[in-house]
């Protein structure tokens, strides 16, 4: 009788058919598993089971769920932050000067770029300021395809993370090109295979697209 009573009280485990992948099932067994990312060489796929905890404030190009999914794949020291919109091209103007003025002195940022087909971007831990004589700043930088839930972390091939010039913004560099290249007036975005992140073209199957909007978020408590 005691065994039958216990069996009635125990909730049956969910069947695997209810989930797309095993990783959708694992969060039921403890919070320590919940935020584990999936690593496939240099590519990371977003775990869509992350519950929104941090918030996006005044943002348009990234919502709370997308932000928390993205954060789950970043280093632990970045996961405690909220995202605050500090620059949006459609509001603040489409020039490098406007961009730099709004992003001045901000070290931890998420840059998002919306095109007709995708939203892509980068997470940077170095200030978005003019680079000295065209040099690249090395930092803990990531590029991502927000539409397809993929993040690429920096490889060991080079340290060409980000360069901000009066006529362009470049993220990543290699023999094949940059992961993200934004022209002077923020009209077009180019993306090529990039050695810095060992990433394919983020706009694939296209190599360039017109920019619909750009938004920068600062990370803070």
Model-derived regions: residue spans:
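Phosphate-recognition beta-domain surfaces
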Residues: 1-221
């Amino acid at each position: 009788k005691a065994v039958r009573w216990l069996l009635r009280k125990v909730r049956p485990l969910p069947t695997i058919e209810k989930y797309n992948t095993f990783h959708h099932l694992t969060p039921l067994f403890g919070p320590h598993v919940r935020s584990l990312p999936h690593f496939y060489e240099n590519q990371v796929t977003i775990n869509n089971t992350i519950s929104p905890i941090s918030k996006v404030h005044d943002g348009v190009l990234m919502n709370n769920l997308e932000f928390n999914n993205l954060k789950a794949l970043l280093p632990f020291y970045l996961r405690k932050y909220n995202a605050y919109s500090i620059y949006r091209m459609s509001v603040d103007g489409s020039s490098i000067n406007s961009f730099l003025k709004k992003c001045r002195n901000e070290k931890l940022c998420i840059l998002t770029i919306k095109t007709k087909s995708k939203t892509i971007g980068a997470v940077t831990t170095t200030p978005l300021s003019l680079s000295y004589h065209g040099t690249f700043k090395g930092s803990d930088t990531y590029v991502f395809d927000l539409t397809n839930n993929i993040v690429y972390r920096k490889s060991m091939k080079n340290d060409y993370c980000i360069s901000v010039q009066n006529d362009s913004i470049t993220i990543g560099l290699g023999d094949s090109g940059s992961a993200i290249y934004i022209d002077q007036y923020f009209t077009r975005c180019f993306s090529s295979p990039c050695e810095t992140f060992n990433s394919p073209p983020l706009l694939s199957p296209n190599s360039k697209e017109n920019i619909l909007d750009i938004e920068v978020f600062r990370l803070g408590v």
